[in-house]
Amino acid sequence: MEKIVCIIPSRYSSSRFQGKPLADLCGKPMIQHVYERVLKSELVSYAAVATDDSRIFEAVRKFGGKAIMTAARHRSGTDRIAEAVNSLDLKDDDIVVNVQGDQPIFEPEQIAEVTRPLREDPSLPMATLIYRIVREEEITHPNAVKVVFDRNFNALYFSRATIPYVRDDRHPIAYYKHHGIYAYRRAFLRTFTALEEGTMERLESLEQLRALEFGYRIRVVETLHDSVEVDTPEELARVRDILLGRAR
């Protein structure tokens, strides 16, 4: 049976929120919330934060977590994860989960959701989660990455633009957004990092487009849990309110 490990990529630098992984969230650094939620998944046999910053590395070690130092420059979080897993004893068919370091309230059961396709189909290289959009403003917002997929739930394209374009609005359609949790076959991570940057990846600034542009399948799985990614202090305040609401 394949092993499932989870790597949390985390960077200190951010144009909109410098140092956000270490931002205080209800008495803990945000990255600790992510790490502790990962450990609630019974499927995960190992978890670590992959970072290029000593402050994040030391903070993770301080709360008892595992951390892996990586090179400072990587094209994407997936490339950073690929470097991190080189230090682990993994087989080619083992599964590596990527949970973003800015998703402190993701649901641990989503790890089971995103890994299910790879556990059921050994030929799949990667999978990711999608969520049906309910907030109308997200349909046109570039930070909500839209996705279209075929009848077998293989991604056709991801875009910051509104896709699909509905020419005749008499036919209502459901829009889906990408939820940034991935699962990869360990062997595919080697393949992915060896690929050159894709044209669409560069234009949209979406790493998953590299896989699609070079002909690799990405299975999408609909989750019923919305994502709240912290990119600004305002979004951190929103997450804090959500956590405090749960505590009451």
From Swiss-Prot:
Gene name of the record: kdsB
InterPro entries named among the record's database cross-references: Cytidylyl_trans (IPR003329), KdsB (IPR004528), Nucleotide-diphossugar_trans (IPR029044)
Protein's name according to its UniProt entry: 3-deoxy-manno-octulosonate cytidylyltransferase
Function: Activates KDO (a required 8-carbon sugar) for incorporation into bacterial lipopolysaccharide in Gram-negative bacteria.
GO CC annotations, alphabetized: cytosol
Subcellular location: Cytoplasm
Keyword Kinase: no
Organism: Syntrophus aciditrophicus (strain SB)
EC number: 2.7.7.38
Pathway: Nucleotide-sugar biosynthesis; CMP-3-deoxy-D-manno-octulosonate biosynthesis; CMP-3-deoxy-D-manno-octulosonate from 3-deoxy-D-manno-octulosonate and CTP: step 1/1; Bacterial outer membrane biogenesis; lipopolysaccharide biosynthesis
KW Nucleotidyltransferase (keyword) present: yes
A GO BP entry: CMP-keto-3-deoxy-D-manno-octulosonic acid biosynthetic process
Catalysed reactions, as listed in the record: 3-deoxy-alpha-D-manno-oct-2-ulosonate + CTP = CMP-3-deoxy-beta-D-manno-octulosonate + diphosphate
GO molecular function: 3-deoxy-manno-octulosonate cytidylyltransferase activity
Similarity comment text for this entry: Belongs to the KdsB family.
Alphabetized UniProt keyword annotations: Cytoplasm, Lipopolysaccharide biosynthesis, Nucleotidyltransferase, Transferase
